Amino acid sequence: MRGGLWQLGQSITRRLAQADKKTIGRRCFASDADLKKTVLYDFHVVNGGKMVPFAGWSMPIQYKDSIMDSTVNCRENGSLFDVSHMCGLSLKGKDTIPFLEKLVIADVAGLAPGTGSLTVFTNEKGGAIDDSVVTKVTNDHIYLVVNAGCRDKDLAHIEEHMKSFKSKGGDVSWHIHDERSLLALQGPLAAPVLQYLTKDDLSKMYFGEFRVLDINGAPCFLTRTGYTGEDGFEISVPSENALDLAKALLEKSEGKIRLTGLGARDSLRLEAGLCLYGNDMEQHTTPVEAGLTWAIGKRRRAEGGFLGAEVILKQIEEGPKIRRVGFFSSGPPPRSHSEIQDSNGQNIGEITSGGFSPCLKKNIAMGYVKTGNHKAGTNVKIVIRGKSYDGVVTKMPFVPTKYYKP
């Protein structure tokens, strides 16, 4: 088991570093002095956080628990993640929705106020610039959270199109929430523990919904969402209140909710079948190929109007040439870039994320295969260090999701 734990930690570290390199380039592998720190940095260190460079930040990859134990504890009890390296921003103005709908695939206009959805920023070729959660606070206020490794290019992309939009009379402005920190509270104890710290009734707040409310005496943006497949919340809190909130959440859980690092977060999202940008989705990958067609609203499919719509809508109609799928496999855990072959030894694709599942106690992976080889039950070979091992295409998520829905 010790060898399996070591392999799990090493594979996750490599996977995060690889996604980091692809999305942000060399500049993030700087000296410790050049790395940014969240307001909880000292709190992480005091609590045994193993700090590593990620997206230009010094972030905890794990604490005293193993990545395997942290993953299982999140699903059985709960986890508290510091995800303040991610970028929250607000778009405001009467033309905010038509502006944003030029850049993303979501039916933002169709969202009810106080609800959100996963979406994708696309380029002119239909490729993914980044994935993001978009929330309609009101018809004139949209709240977004984008990936840390994509922050610079995302903001440059939005700003470039905003300047053009405003030059034609469009009413839209933005605010980047650098004054706030972001905590992710995930797992079955997330809601009951958070309920201790707010007067709002969380039992009537469902997956994908958003509220502005008081938590532990601080004005917070609360979204019922996450990156683990579990029920949970992302809490945008004024940075001066972040430490007190983190301590209060851990205290109220009586030790059952634990501080959890990027390692277990990656393991959890892989078990949930969720993409890691830079690995499972890149600028040459379309949302259709990535299995995110469901995120393109019916109206958007009919009207288009977003960057790359011609390419994406054609793929919806005719089908993509490649598709993201899940795998179970034998042998060593698959790694990113491991070759996928059919039963005749012909190349049909490539692994993008893979590892040992702490919850299923078996190898899981996702990757892209040529259409025709994508159906669940299809037998494949996965090549690892020159040797081929048996694999089978399987449906995702690997671990059933537990989102809180009415």
Swiss-Prot record:
Gene3D superfamilies: Aminomethyltransferase beta-barrel domains (3.30.70.1400), Aminomethyltransferase fragment (4.10.1250.10), Probable tRNA modification gtpase trme, domain 1 (3.30.1360.120). It catalyses: N(6)-[(R)-S(8)-aminomethyldihydrolipoyl]-L-lysyl-[protein] + (6S)-5,6,7,8-tetrahydrofolate = N(6)-[(R)-dihydrolipoyl]-L-lysyl-[protein] + (6R)-5,10-methylene-5,6,7,8-tetrahydrofolate + NH4(+). Belongs to the GcvT family. The glycine cleavage system catalyzes the degradation of glycine. GO terms for cellular component: glycine cleavage complex; mitochondrion. This is Aminomethyltransferase, mitochondrial. InterPro entries: GCS_T, GCST_C, GCV_T_N, GcvT/YgfZ/DmdA, GcvT/YgfZ_C, TrmE/GcvT_dom1. Keywords: Aminotransferase, Mitochondrion, Transferase, Transit peptide. GO terms for molecular function: aminomethyltransferase activity; transaminase activity. Its EC number is 2.1.2.10. One of its GO terms (biological process) is glycine catabolic process. Substrate binds at E234, R265, Y403. Its main location: mitochondrion. PANTHER family: AMINOMETHYLTRANSFERASE, AMINOMETHYLTRANSFERASE, MITOCHONDRIAL. Disulfide bonds: none annotated. It comes from Solanum tuberosum. It is found in: Mitochondrion. Residues 1-29 form a transit peptide. It comes from the Eukaryota.
